[in-house]
Amino acid sequence: LSSLVLQRLGADITASDHHPLAGEFLLRNSTLNQLPPIHYACCDWALDYPELGRFNLIIGSDLLYERDHPALLAGFIDRHTLADAQVLIVDPRRGHAASFTRAMAQVGYMQSADLRNGHVCADVPFTGRILNYCRHSA
């Protein structure tokens, strides 16, 4: 959803996922929303994708649901971000955020905020949090 919203706002988007059908779903949703196709890459966090490039902003949602995900995701982010970058991760509190924060610190990121307030819609409170990490070149 965030890719579609950002595409609508005119951002330069590259979406990725490791699910084999995610690219098809993204293309279908882009078409339904009368948007041009969004650049998409199916990625395994353990592998390197030099052709993917480096980004100044990475946004992810509900990514930390397995014990090995914090280290894998932090490594993937490190390989695909510029020296100055921001990372926003929506975390529904599955228990791996602290490990992820430690792994991000090892690759030079500081957690600048833990945004907790908000509502999914008018009557539904958001019980998760948005983890915000920044890295700046020296």
Predicted regions and their residues:
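S-adenosylmethionine-dependent methyltransferases
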Residues: 1-138
